[in-house]
Amino acid sequence: MKDAKPFPVLKNDNLLRAARGEVVDRVPVWVMRQAGRYLPEFQELRKHHDFFTVCRTPELACEVTMQPLRRFDLDASIIFSDILVIPQALGLTVEMHAGVGPVLPQPIVVPEDLKRLTPDGALSRLSYVGDAITMMRHKLEGRVPLIGFTGAPWTLMGYMIEGGGSKTMSKAKAWLNEHPEDSKLFLNLLTDAIVDYLEMQVKAGAQMLQVFESSAEHLSKEQFLQWCVPYLKRIRDELVDRLTKKAIPVVPMTLFAKGAGHSLKEQSELGYDVIGLDWTVDPLEARNLVGPNITLQGNLDPQDMYRDPDELRNLTTEMVHKFGKSRYIANLGHGITPQTPITSMEVLVEAVHKAL
C-alpha cells in the first residue's frame, strides 16, 4: 500500500481550504468525470485497454487521472475508477458494454442470492485502487489534492439488483417494499465494505473523499430518509471513528445525493463537510437550508457545457456569484457528458477563477 517515500508538499490547497471553511485564494473548481470520454486522449487509450483494465492497472489509472490536469487549470484530481468496483470485489461480474454502460450478467434477484456475495477478502481485491492512489500522489508532485470516492449503499444495491443502470430502479425499489429486512441486511453489508474501502483510500493517500448516492433521484423524501440517510451517516461516523482511533488525520468528505434536493437540511446533519448539489437546486435556497458551516459543491447543468462560450461564461459567473467565495467548490451538477467540447472546460475553469 502506501510506500515509505513521503508525499510531495501540496502547493494548491484551495479545495481542502474550501471544504474546511477556510479562506481561499480563488474558488476551487473540478468536474465530475473530468477524466473521461470527452477527452480524445482518453478515447485513444481506451482503444487499447478495456475499461476495467484501466481501473485495475495503477499506471493506466494514473495516466487517465492526469489527462485533464494537462489541459486545464483544475484545483483537484479525482482518481480514475468506478463505483462498481465494490460489487466486483463482492463477487459479482461487471462488464462495460459500449453504448450501454455497465452490465451485471448475474444480478441479485432474490434474497437467497445475497449468499453469493463474498465480503470476506473484498478489501484485498480492491488493493489496486490504493496502489493507484499512492502512485498518483507522487505523480501529482503536490500540484492539487487527490480525491478518492465510492458509490453509496442504495446506489450500489440498485445496480446489483437491476443488473446495470436503470431509468426507474423498479426492481430495486420493489426489494425495499417486498424484502425490507433483507434490504437492510444488503445495505449494511455494502456499508461495511464501503467503510473499509474508504479507510484504505485515506491510508493510501486520498486527501478528500466523495460518496456518490447517484440513484437517490429514484426515491421519495420518505424513502431517502429511510433507505439512504442511516447508511450515509454510518459511513461518515464509522470512518471518522476508525481514523481517529488510529491517529490518522480525518480528510474532508463530500456527500453527493443526486435528486435529493428535498432533503438538504437532513443531509447537512450527517457530519459531511461538503454537500454536492445537482443543477435543479437553487444555490441561495441550498445555503439557507444547510446553514453557514457546510461547504456546497456544484452545480452547473452539464447540458450548459454545450452552449456558446459567452453564454457559458455568463452562466458560470452568475453561478459563482450566487454561491460566493466562502465554503464553495465549483463543479457541474452531475458528470460531464461525452460530447462536451474541450473549449467548454477551458471556459468553465477560467470563468470560475475570474468570477470573484
UniProtKB/Swiss-Prot annotation:
<comment type="similarity">
    <text>Belongs to the uroporphyrinogen decarboxylase family.</text>
</comment>
<dbReference type="GO" id="GO:0006783">
    <property type="term" value="P:heme biosynthetic process"/>
</dbReference>
<feature type="binding site">
    <location>
        <position position="159"/>
    </location>
    <ligand>
        <name>coproporphyrinogen I</name>
    </ligand>
</feature>
<dbReference type="InterPro" id="IPR006361">
    <property type="entry name" value="Uroporphyrinogen_deCO2ase_HemE"/>
</dbReference>
<keyword id="KW-0456">Lyase</keyword>
<feature type="binding site">
    <location>
        <position position="35"/>
    </location>
    <ligand>
        <name>coproporphyrinogen I</name>
    </ligand>
</feature>
<feature type="binding site">
    <location>
        <position position="214"/>
    </location>
    <ligand>
        <name>coproporphyrinogen I</name>
    </ligand>
</feature>
<keyword id="KW-0210">Decarboxylase</keyword>
<feature type="binding site">
    <location>
        <position position="37"/>
    </location>
    <ligand>
        <name>coproporphyrinogen III</name>
    </ligand>
</feature>
<feature type="binding site">
    <location>
        <position position="82"/>
    </location>
    <ligand>
        <name>coproporphyrinogen III</name>
    </ligand>
</feature>
<feature type="binding site">
    <location>
        <position position="37"/>
    </location>
    <ligand>
        <name>coproporphyrinogen I</name>
    </ligand>
</feature>
<feature type="site" description="Transition state stabilizer">
    <location>
        <position position="82"/>
    </location>
</feature>
<feature type="binding site">
    <location>
        <position position="46"/>
    </location>
    <ligand>
        <name>coproporphyrinogen I</name>
    </ligand>
</feature>
<keyword id="KW-0627">Porphyrin biosynthesis</keyword>
<feature type="binding site">
    <location>
        <position position="159"/>
    </location>
    <ligand>
        <name>coproporphyrinogen III</name>
    </ligand>
</feature>
<feature type="binding site">
    <location>
        <position position="33"/>
    </location>
    <ligand>
        <name>coproporphyrinogen I</name>
    </ligand>
</feature>
<dbReference type="InterPro" id="IPR000257">
    <property type="entry name" value="Uroporphyrinogen_deCOase"/>
</dbReference>
<dbReference type="GO" id="GO:0004853">
    <property type="term" value="F:uroporphyrinogen decarboxylase activity"/>
</dbReference>
<feature type="binding site">
    <location>
        <position position="334"/>
    </location>
    <ligand>
        <name>coproporphyrinogen III</name>
    </ligand>
</feature>
<feature type="binding site">
    <location>
        <position position="214"/>
    </location>
    <ligand>
        <name>coproporphyrinogen III</name>
    </ligand>
</feature>
<keyword id="KW-0963">Cytoplasm</keyword>
<dbReference type="Pfam" id="PF01208">
    <property type="entry name" value="URO-D"/>
</dbReference>
<dbReference type="GO" id="GO:0006782">
    <property type="term" value="P:protoporphyrinogen IX biosynthetic process"/>
</dbReference>
<keyword id="KW-0350">Heme biosynthesis</keyword>
<feature type="binding site">
    <location>
        <position position="33"/>
    </location>
    <ligand>
        <name>coproporphyrinogen III</name>
    </ligand>
</feature>
<feature type="binding site">
    <location>
        <position position="82"/>
    </location>
    <ligand>
        <name>coproporphyrinogen I</name>
    </ligand>
</feature>
<dbReference type="InterPro" id="IPR038071">
    <property type="entry name" value="UROD/MetE-like_sf"/>
</dbReference>
<feature type="binding site">
    <location>
        <position position="334"/>
    </location>
    <ligand>
        <name>coproporphyrinogen I</name>
    </ligand>
</feature>
<comment type="pathway">
    <text>Porphyrin-containing compound metabolism; protoporphyrin-IX biosynthesis; coproporphyrinogen-III from 5-aminolevulinate: step 4/4.</text>
</comment>
<comment type="subunit">
    <text>Homodimer.</text>
</comment>
<comment type="function">
    <text>Catalyzes the decarboxylation of four acetate groups of uroporphyrinogen-III to yield coproporphyrinogen-III.</text>
</comment>
<protein>
    <recommendedName>
        <fullName>Uroporphyrinogen decarboxylase</fullName>
        <ecNumber>4.1.1.37</ecNumber>
    </recommendedName>
</protein>
<feature type="binding site">
    <location>
        <position position="35"/>
    </location>
    <ligand>
        <name>coproporphyrinogen III</name>
    </ligand>
</feature>
<dbReference type="GO" id="GO:0005829">
    <property type="term" value="C:cytosol"/>
</dbReference>
